Amino acid sequence: MYPVYGGNGITGYHSKYNVDRPTLVIGRVGFYCGSTHITEEFAWITDNAFITTFNEDNISIEWLKLLLDSLELRNRSSSTAQPVISGKTIYPILIPLPPLAEQYRIVSQIAEIMPFIDNLTQ
């Protein structure tokens, strides 16, 4: 069984998969729209999430997740009863692209300090 990813991470399991490598998904619909998740190697992604595609030779998936999280994409959702983010809203966003080695350094440093930040917020 493979995990099924919806708008806010794993929502269940299915006998089939539609991605065959870790994939960055962005919640598209609902209270958690704009949330990001990195899937397991084999997973099913519903239409409640965007599948990101990018050149893995130039972009670290972990760095891209951190960057998208910092953009607070939820704030770009429509203001309806059921929040929705459209591709038209997020596709034009320009992002800085440091060299791959710098992306890895950023991810490593953030991973190092997150336990301290988590302790401060508890």
PLM features: residue spans?
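A short beta-sheet element
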Residues: G6-D69, R74, S78-Y91
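Amphipathic alpha-helical coiled-coil/heptad-repeat segments
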Residues: P92-Q122
